Amino acid sequence: MSEKPEKIVLASGNAGKLEEFGNLFKPYSITVLPQSAFGIPECPEPYPTFVENALAKARHAAKYSGLPALADDSGICAAALNGAPGIHSARYAGDNPKSDTANNLKLAAELVGKADKSCCYVCVLVFVRHKDDPRPIIAEGVWHGQWNDTPLGQNGFGYDPYFYLPEHGKTAAELDTEVKNRESHRAQALAELLRKLAL
């Protein structure tokens, strides 16, 4: 990338994601601002893939903010459920209101009795320099784990308390922040994005 932006807008209202991306970009002296700082309305996510939804959100945020924008579309995919909840992870149990607890309970109920508890977190990041960027930068990270029937840990959000990592003997919510920032699906996708941005 020819010049490094000082500020980018994150196309999300999720406080957990904002903190995570803020920490990951800090070493590069790039400030990550929430789209709420610009009064950006929520972008529809009508598409069946992580890539299409992330691209729509990035263009939407760049249009309203006038800044380069980063969007992520991410979710958990359970092998026994053919990849569900997938793109529906954030609203798996509905919208009234969105709730991590309700989402976790729904997925836990659907995995009861399933022999295959393997699942993965997927993160697709899309960076656009401006709203009409003809060459968006796309990166993907996949973090493999197992569904844990009992929630463990406080250091995380979303499905983290149930996402068990056999190599650590812990759930994602039990990992130290430093480890999570190095190994998570978002960290993997961001590492690929940073390589492509040549920061």
Swiss-Prot record:
It is an enzyme of class 3 (hydrolase). The active site is at 73 (proton acceptor). Binds 1 Mg(2+) ion per subunit. It catalyses: XTP + H2O = XMP + diphosphate + H(+); dITP + H2O = dIMP + diphosphate + H(+); ITP + H2O = IMP + diphosphate + H(+). Its cofactor is Mg(2+). It holds the Pfam family Ham1p_like. GO terms for biological process: nucleoside triphosphate catabolic process; nucleotide metabolic process; purine nucleoside triphosphate catabolic process. Keywords: Hydrolase, Magnesium, Metal-binding, Nucleotide metabolism, Nucleotide-binding. The keyword Membrane does not apply. Pyrophosphatase that catalyzes the hydrolysis of nucleoside triphosphates to their monophosphate derivatives, with a high preference for the non-canonical purine nucleotides XTP (xanthosine triphosphate), dITP (deoxyinosine triphosphate) and ITP. Seems to function as a house-cleaning enzyme that removes non-canonical purine nucleotides from the nucleotide pool, thus preventing their incorporation into DNA/RNA and avoiding chromosomal lesions. PANTHER family: INOSINE TRIPHOSPHATE PYROPHOSPHATASE, INOSINE TRIPHOSPHATE PYROPHOSPHATASE/HAM1 PROTEIN. Homodimer. This is dITP/XTP pyrophosphatase. It comes from Neisseria meningitidis serogroup B (strain ATCC BAA-335 / MC58).
